[in-house]
């Protein structure tokens, strides 16, 4: 058993010798003889031939070596095939992961850029809306002040008309009393008050009346009284018409202000709501941008990790492929040597014997 193992080891070493198919058996053996391991195996062969030992034992060992080499290659092929499938699965997964991260980076970059643009537009618009709110509030205040001034003017003028109409009515009563025969002296105090009130108004409408009343104070006659009563009636009618016109103007202005103030209020509400929406949007935009930037950084790191993993896997696969090819080539060379030795031992035994005899004489 020990002898068989020794021969197996020596022959296996010889199997690694570099030879070419174009060489003759003697040349093959000569090449093997130049190698220290080859010299050893040939010494064993020479001993076998000299002692008449069975060459078949060496043939069996060579057959076992060939079988071992073929078996190792089949195992290596199976492992290589399994590793290739696993590698392709890993590569496909990594490429898919890389594509996913690249897609995410593009999407996040677009989100960051579009949101940044939207943020800028919102910030510009919120400044415009803020200015519009200020203008709206100023317009409301100005128009409200104008309306209040109009109303105050109407109140004042309406009160003046009431006072003037009361003065006209009082004057009509005095004149009617004079017409009825009441002495002027009895009505003088009332007359002077009415006259003073009419003069305070400084209205051109009352100038003819004031002149007529002044004349009536110095001379009372029925003709003058009739003219004054007619004049008083005309003036009162004009005052009534003027007061009605002022009231109509007041009501029209009040109605217009109600519509205008409602419009301004609605516009103010809309602007305030728009500003609140924009301010909330600005906050959300900033949050979105921050999150997009952070996610973009994460996705970039994930992409780099995946690309590094892919590079490592590709290097590993290249190394495995190179190792597999080298080992396959080595086994092929070893198998070729074994096959040539088998050929020498089986088909060219006479040439081997001749060479060994010559070798014995020389060495």
UniProtKB/Swiss-Prot annotation:
It comes from Paramecium tetraurelia. The keyword Signal applies. One of its GO terms (cellular component) is trichocyst. The keyword Amino-acid biosynthesis does not apply. Belongs to the TMP family. Residues 85-119, 244-352 form a coiled coil. Structural protein that crystallize inside the trichocyst matrix. Two components are produced by post-translational processing from the precursor peptide. It is found in: Trichocyst. This is Trichocyst matrix protein T4-B. Keywords: Coiled coil, Signal. It comes from the Eukaryota. Residues 1-17 form the signal peptide. Residues 18-52, 190-221 form a propeptide. Its main location: other.
